[in-house]
Amino acid sequence: MPFKGKSRDDNSPMTETFSGASPLPHWGVIRARGADAAQFIHGQLSQDFVLLGPDQARLAAFCNAKGRMQASFIGIKPDAQTILLVCERSLLAQTLKRLRMFVLRAQCQLDDASEAFALWGLVGASVPAPCTSAWQVHSDGTAHTIGLPPGADHARALWLGPAGTAPPQVPQLPTATWQWLEVMSAV
């Protein structure tokens, strides 16, 4: 049941219902391309990207040799030779540098594709029906909508499209609202 009413902290974005889209400037995208992209990413992260279907997403972690998580990702495989990894932008450069160290002879190119994509968080009624289940991906050509676990009983999805394009026409929510719902989703 969602929290209704005021919190002790009046800066909290708590309200009865949320519906809309929030820009996600604090997130970025790592793109892995090539014949060995899925196999390479599968060997470096905590999830299986080899068997990942185009209609599925995975929550994955990049860990150090001691097993400590260095970065977490939401990953999709839009085609057989491409993996897109969405992560916190502040961790992207150092994680990309570390991943590149292990490419060696693999036919895989890694790059920071953040400028090539627009990232929006969809909440509530703005989440399309095919994405109300967590980790389901709905693609409509160039844009991908990824269902995420709900936060405070509000459906959530990540919209990933080409830079310069906008998500479905819905009210815009502050980024702080998305961040609060992200915490409330307990992922």
Q: How would you describe each model-predicted region?
A:
Residues 2-187:
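Basic, glycine/lysine-rich polyanion-binding surfaces/domains
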